[in-house]
């Protein structure tokens, strides 16, 4: 490698952005084909390619940052800005769903019966499974903070335990949400109530699955001694993302489940 007189990371050419883009194309086209023609082949191919891309891209970043030392303080600063901007874009993504919900619920049209929830819709009880889900996610926010403090204090065993607990709580949330969807008395096809409910809570659920995966990668890295008390941005990014998912759920719970019912 040629000598460089600066602290910035000159990235080597990589095939993963291309394979990631192809995976996204296959998954979105596959989704449309699944909806219209009931075939999941293309979507499955896209998912497999996406998982392969994720694995190999993350592997390369771990090699560059942990083993080759390319993640100098200025590079880490850039990664921090990148993660902050990404979470900001996600805030606006969810803002669209809240806008749709409040637009529909604050001035219900005569077609909806002039009331909210619309005529014929039986909303879910906010004090049953949704309240338990809120408690589960808030507890996971506590355990991920515990993991962060453990890493900063060099408490390896505690960090592993608290991270594993956070992932288990995330999986428990996902299982409860799946059960709630299965037993819901309305579907995504039930007018604007069904659409806004399932799209907003469904995308949040997807983000919980992504966050759990992110934390699972951090757990594997922590087990393999990748994180030190000074050098653990991968975990920090995962923790920020998890707190974001937490806050979005609180807004969803208060707006759609509690006020909306």
Swiss-Prot record:
It is found in: Mitochondrion inner membrane. The gene is mt-co3. The chain crosses the membrane at residues 16-34, 41-66, 73-105, 129-152, 156-183, 191-223, 233-256. It comes from Cyprinus carpio. Keywords: Membrane, Mitochondrion, Mitochondrion inner membrane, Translocase, Transmembrane, Transmembrane helix. Residues 35-40, 106-128, 184-190, 257-261 are mitochondrial intermembrane. GO terms for biological process: mitochondrial electron transport, cytochrome c to oxygen. Belongs to the cytochrome c oxidase subunit 3 family. Its EC number is 7.1.1.9. It catalyses: 4 Fe(II)-[cytochrome c] + O2 + 8 H(+)(in) = 4 Fe(III)-[cytochrome c] + 2 H2O + 4 H(+)(out). One of its GO terms (cellular component) is mitochondrial inner membrane. InterPro entries: Cyt_c/ubiquinol_Oxase_su3 (IPR024791), Cyt_c_oxase_su3_dom (IPR033945), Cyt_c_oxidase-like_su3 (IPR000298), Cyt_c_oxidase_su3-like_sf (IPR035973), Cyt_c_oxidase_su3_a-hlx (IPR013833). This is Cytochrome c oxidase subunit 3. Residues 1-15, 67-72, 153-155, 224-232 are mitochondrial matrix. GO terms for molecular function: cytochrome-c oxidase activity.
